[in-house]
Amino acid sequence: MWNKKLALLFILLMSLALVACGGTEATETPAEAETGETIETGDLPDLGGREITVAVENAYLPFNYIDPATGEPAGWDYDAINAICELLNCTPVYVEAAWEGMIQAVADGQYDMAADGITITEDRREIVDFSDGYISIEQRLLARIDDDRFDSVQSFVDNPELVMGTQTGTTNFETASDILPADRIQAFEQFPFAVQALIAGDIDAVIIDETSGMGYQGVNADSLKLVGESLSSDQLGFVFPKGSDLVGPVNAALAAMEANGTLATLAEKYFTDAFTITYEDLE
């Protein structure tokens, strides 16, 4: 299954990519994470209870959303950052923010960091700093299941009648712009709107991260499919203002969470069949 492969990829990526950073002052008291894992906090920086403002969209499954059963914020980002702050002795203060403008707002110092399944790119590195990558995401085409006009990215590009949808301000939009002229791209404020347009027949495909695409396909198994090869493979990371003193401690916490199995537990919770919440549930 795609999601089990993704979970294994998650663990492998963290094993290869994360680099532990030493701290100055440490605490020896174990902390209990949301995942149920006991996290040893020795040899990690102690932020002394510092409040950390975290920008989240609350509209990007499975990273952050409002749980329809409880009305409370939930998702991978919340569990991961809560665990990070337990390790580092900090207090997360979550602030809902629109995706469009979120990265610039972090760059301007409005937030201490942002967590929204954000792709690490060199262009973004010019204005913000990133944590180490914590997951690798493939970009794919989502199409109607009965559409046989294309079976690959290239055959989609070669058909001048086909229009691709995506979300504005994303790396998916950038990828679409690299392969198609502007008049064959329709940008939406959020991916759910793009998928609705696809199902309605207003557009012919949506370029989307595979994690989200599989979620939409699962909910609409009789009407949607993923088509063709991966367009790109991107790493996701947390975003910080340039020069932030939080990057090193957060990277150290991520490395500790990879080592003690917390990240593997989160991968199992959010990137396998265990996660059943859909965008339809959020409506």
Residue ranges and their predicted role:
Residues 76-79, 94-104, 151, 186-200, ...:
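Short helix-initiation/N-cap motifs at beta->coil->alpha
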Residues 100-104, 118-127, 175-178, 199-200, ...:
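A ligand-binding cleft/hinge motif common to bilobed small-molecule-binding domains
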Residues 36-118, 126:
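Extracytoplasmic small-molecule ligand-binding "clamshell" domains
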Residues 16-20:
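C-terminal motif of bacterial Sec signal peptides marking the signal peptidase cleavage site
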Residues 78-87, 145-147, 162, 170, ...:
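Extended ligand-binding regions for polar small-molecule ligands
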Residues 58, 136-143, 210-255, 273-283:
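Periplasmic-binding protein-like
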